Amino acid sequence: MLCALILWSGLLGAARASPISVPRECAKGSEVWCQDLQAAAKCRAVRHCQSAVWNKPTVKSLPCSVCQDVAAAAGNGVNPGATESDILTSVMKTCEWLPSQESSAKCKWMVNNHSAAVLSMLSGAQETDLASVCTALTLCEPLQRHLAETTSERPLTQEDANEVMAPFLSNGALSFHPSQMPEGAVCHDCVQLISLLQDALESNLTLAEVTVQNQCQSMGPGLAALCENYIHRQFVPAKQTLQGLPPQEVCRKGGFCERESAHWLTRVAAVDGVPSLEMEMPRTNELQMQLGLTCDVCLNLVQELDKWLVTNSTEALISHTLERVCTVVPEPLVQQCITLVDTYSPELVQLMSKVTPEKVCETIKLCGSKRRARSISRAVATTPSLPVDEENQGSFCQGCKRLLGMSSQNLDHKSTKRDILNAFKGGCRILPLPYVMQCNRFVAEYEPVLIESLKFMMNPTDLCKKMGACHGPKTPLLGTDQCVMGPSFWCKSPEAAEMCNALEHCQRLVWKKPVSKINEQP
């Protein structure tokens, strides 16, 4: 009996001495309990926080959106074969989206040590129950808490909620047209920003580089390395641009500031039919346009051909070279070069390996004294010409069709199909984890349909016509052929009469001389 009393008193003392112990800070209420899942579990308030705090609206962020997608997929049974371990692994991977390593490690620790609570919240029937796990793991921040920190404890209003959750809707309906900025405001902001960057580079280059690189850490583990590599490649030319040019010039090159017109370009407008008093000075390229641009194009074209035809001057090589030469001329002259090749290629083939560039351009009437460019309607060829496909003309037509034809045939190769399949599966990797398996399964099942669709779309003839490489015969524009000037040009000289097929007309009606005397003229 004495032993029983001693045992009873000992148990009673132990029970009175050790109640359900909780940390002292838990007495501060839900502000402390619901900071995260660890604090709620320590204060034994997980259910309270889940129903009263964590299910409330949250601030929009990338980690929060990814976590909510994963939680919704786990709770709705998108992958019915997933085990509890698979679900916890998916949730733990979302912790890697947090910006700092410390917060990411704490999130993973909470998932690992409070897995039962995480699975319990994911098994909830309500959508708010599923999303509450993201707030518990600090992947989502409660909207009320965010506003309390940024507005000095000011109570939440509907205007504040609109500003945080959907700032683009707070001032009216969504518009895809940006609001009009005051004139010069963008230029002023650009100049101010470039000036600050130049000051930072001059004062401390290492600090500026480190500051820029630190921004990559907020992009998540998958993109941080790519971001840093990009910055390393772009930082040196950006630094040279910033240090070598004044802020105004940098912003003008970027299109943020309008280019100032020089005072000598100012001209007085004509009034009542009186011509302008000051003539505008044209730019260099405009002077070339007025002083025989077509002749310059021809000379550049033939000189480039000479460089490529030193060892071999066959007609096949010349024709092939004509298709490539327009890629090396200056950008403003590319279109004129293409037109030149289409129109004058037969004459160039005949003359290329025999005469100098100046003689070539002079012979086909592109260079010379007061001669304008003309379009020759017939080729001066001594050999019979091959039949021409009326619908597939153009210097790049055959090359375009050969290229696309080979590409279409390569679609049947196993290696090409494997590369296409890997490319499509690579696109699946950017999706949230629950959808990756479904995307890969879709690509594998529909691979034959995708390949056949690509082959159907890559019809060489149709694609080359759409790109303009193949086209029908082009009619010379009125005014580009000197022969349309009539007898005043035909009968100017025997060469002009022969060129315009009007030798007999000039002899009979204008010159009224025998053919023998005409041929004797110099």
Curated annotation (Swiss-Prot):
Function: May activate the lysosomal degradation of sphingolipids.
Gene coding for it: Psapl1
Top-level division of the source organism's lineage: Eukaryota
Residue span(s) of domain Saposin A-type: 19-59, 476-516
Domain Saposin B-type per the UniProt entry, residue ranges: 60-144, 183-261, 291-371, 393-474
SMART domains: SAPA, SapB
Record-linked Gene3D superfamilies: Saposin-like
Glycosylation sites: N204, N312
GO cellular component, one term: membrane
Keyword entries, A-Z: Disulfide bond, Glycoprotein, Lipid metabolism, Repeat, Secreted, Signal, Sphingolipid metabolism
Residue stretch(es) of the prosequence: 18-59, 146-183, 261-290, 371-392, 475-522
Name assigned to this protein: Proactivator polypeptide-like 1
Record's signal peptide: 1-17
A GO BP annotation: sphingolipid metabolic process
InterPro entries per UniProt: SAP_A, SapB_1, SapB_2, Saposin, Saposin-like, Saposin_chordata, SaposinB_dom, Sphingo_Act-Surfact_Prot
